[in-house]
């Protein structure tokens, strides 16, 4: 990762031990979650309060306006002490580096954390050193969900690890009945570029160069064009449906209605599928002609505001949040601690094992575009527009990507 920031040093003499001065202290914790996930976080906060008498954790649920509200808080000097974080380059100047805490007497043993998570929470400083700005709280990799009942009805064997996109397309063609609006595979009509980069990586490409300086030769590389062409061909041929556009509905609705045989996603839809009583299976991602498969990681981390008035208490909360007790309470994502995943038998559970198995495929050398250039947010808007054009026009893909690369490069330098 080449995103560069000035390092911020922690003050010496950190008070790590339980502190009587914390009595009657309020710690503000901001989250983007809602519903069941929010209730889990409130339960973790309550457990922390019980272990730290006199401390109140004020859980602030910002919801869909998370980034806007968080940025406003930082700008007004009224940021929460602890917050959910993912976009470290954008917020780095406002976040407290945690390396001194990690190495201190009241540090955190990172050996139990699942491999591949920590690079997502580090930035590179001007002097070439790196700073850890967050501690992983939960994650998901990307896998393939398949509808077992649809496979059974079509007389098809279930997908297995090591399969390819050719295998997936062959199954999709046999599952599809376009005249009945039944499809073998679901293509996201408006994907998050962050998630979509999984496909580019697996075909040997990416959105941006390793040094983060250009998208030309990457966003518009032949390997990138091939990925988009494949999805367009699948939609045109009736193998796949472009979900989330027009009246096609969401992939969850289609899957639950037995109108969709396969879809690639993270852990998020699993509770919906289970609540709907679906008979489904989970398998790893297919490869592009035997090339190494790579999955991006949807990860949430906890960070501390640089200007927090109670950084030591905030660290205690972050550390508690990463404890086996708290991690085990997070039942709606994959545990960040190997010991918790093992204790829950997830590595042997056919519905969860593929998520864990995909994590080593989250190669630290393939860091997401937003970690490679602090201006990626502006370039991503160009990429999003290009993806939408490709799926609307379904032609001239290379020209669309060439134009997008030229405009994205300008956005990177603004």
Residue ranges, per PLM feature:
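Extracytoplasmic "Venus flytrap"
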Residues: 27-43, 63, 140, 371-375
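Conserved C-terminal helix/tail region of periplasmic/extracytoplasmic solute-binding proteins
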Residues: 56, 152, 158, 233-239, ...
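Hinge/lid segment of periplasmic solute-binding proteins
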Residues: 87-141, 199, 283, 348-351
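Short, solvent-exposed loop/beta-turn-alpha elements that line the ligand-binding surface or hinge
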Residues: 100-116, 161, 183-185, 205-226, ...
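C-terminal lobe and pocket-closing loops
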Residues: 103, 269-279, 289-385, 413
